[in-house]
């Protein structure tokens, strides 16, 4: 794996302090220098001066990503004890551990932007902040676990790979590690799916039925089409691609792979338009997406309640550790 710091070296504090936007200049001049630097492909470090709009946008983006990693383990966690073999149990356990680790990394990135981790977790559990739509749905079979690990993680990594050049340097560096580990998760998921589709007729049907249920949420996952010119996350280079660009990339890669396995994609309108060089598909249900991510999904409240109970049960551990740290200070 390439060293993330080699891709995005952290400048010494003295050198960064000499940057124009870190100088004692009028706000408008600072803003102009900052905006020009970001637009030209430059990186921003936590100790740099940054406009409130930028800080707020990065924090919101990273916080939702962290929430999604933390909540995203729950659909798969439920299947660790029901995995069909010891090897599958170990692989699924390792995947869940990776995802929790990603959440820890991302909350740490977000903390540097001024919001304490406790506040982020409280907001998540109170339903004040969001997590990705796909983690609000139930997992009904082992086929779901294969589809999640292969296709949900694939849709995620399409977006995450575009974040490796985020203008906020700590986020970009963190994405190097996360993308590498997610690529392993995708291989695990594909192996589960291939094993099932090459097994018995009932095993193959398990995967097809799971794909039928998950296709809608998958197509919603990157969000509705938006106006590139009005997208402030694109303006600040927090992300690099529009929702539709990500969805098109996902379809280009994974539609052929699904068809290669003989699986039927549950969208009769799905086709590639050679003239327009784009995929045509049934418009996703955006009202459903908005309802789900605001806490009205099939398992939204169950998953949040699990996290609340888990947080209460482990409160004594946090209090003990913080007490020991305070005593040693």
Predicted segment positions?
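Extreme N-terminal leader/anchor segments
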Residues: 1-50, 317-329
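Extended, helix-rich structural scaffolds rather than catalytic motifs
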Residues: 2-12, 205-329
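Conserved alpha-helical segments that form or flank metal/cofactor-binding pockets of metalloenzymes
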Residues: 13-32, 95-123, 192-194
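Acidic/His metal-coordination segments adjacent to aromatic residues that form catalytic metal sites
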Residues: 43-63, 123-149, 166, 199-200, ...
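Helix-loop segments that flank and shape redox-cofactor active sites
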Residues: 49-54, 72-94, 156-171
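Alpha-helical scaffold segments that form or flank carboxylate-/histidine-based iron centers
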Residues: 54-65, 83-102, 145, 170-182, ...
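Internal, conserved structured core segments that host functional sites
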Residues: 135-188
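A contiguous pocket-lining binding segment that forms or flanks enzyme active sites
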Residues: 170-233
């Amino acid at each position: 794996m390439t060293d993330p710091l080699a891709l995005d070296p952290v400048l010494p504090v003295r050198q960064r302090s000499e940057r124009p936007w870190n100088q004692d200049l009028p706000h408008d001049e600072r803003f102009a220098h900052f905006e020009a630097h970001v637009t030209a492909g430059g990186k921003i470090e936590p100790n740099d001066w940054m406009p409130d709009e930028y800080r707020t946008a990065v924090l919101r983006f990273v916080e939702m990503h962290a929430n999604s990693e933390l909540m995203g383990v729950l659909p798969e966690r439920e299947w660790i004890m029901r995995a069909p073999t010891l090897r599958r149990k170990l692989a699924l356990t390792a995947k869940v551990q990776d995802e929790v680790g990603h959440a820890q990394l991302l909350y740490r990135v977000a903390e540097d932007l001024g919001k304490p981790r406790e506040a982020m977790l409280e907001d998540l559990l109170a339903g004040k902040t969001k997590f990705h739509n796909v983690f609000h749905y139930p997992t009904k079979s082992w086929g779901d676990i294969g589809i999640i690990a292969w296709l949900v993680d694939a849709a995620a990594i399409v977006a995450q790979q575009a974040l490796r050049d985020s203008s906020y340097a700590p986020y970009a560096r963190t994405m190097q590690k996360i993308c590498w580990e997610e690529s392993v998760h995708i291989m695990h998921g594909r192996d589960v799916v291939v094993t099932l589709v090459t097994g018995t007729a009932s095993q193959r049907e398990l995967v097809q039925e799971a794909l039928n249920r998950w296709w809608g949420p998958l197509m919603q996952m990157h969000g509705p089409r938006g106006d590139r010119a009005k997208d402030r996350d694109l303006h600040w280079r927090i992300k690099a691609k529009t929702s539709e660009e990500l969805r098109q990339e996902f379809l280009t890669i994974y539609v052929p792979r699904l068809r290669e396995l003989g699986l039927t994609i549950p969208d009769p309108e799905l086709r590639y338009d050679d003239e327009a060089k784009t995929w045509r598909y049934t418009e996703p249900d955006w009202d459903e997406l908005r309802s789900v991510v605001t806490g009205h999904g099939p398992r939204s409240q169950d998953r949040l309640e699990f996290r609340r109970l888990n947080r209460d049960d482990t409160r004594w551990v946090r209090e003990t550790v913080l007490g020991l740290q305070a005593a040693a200070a």
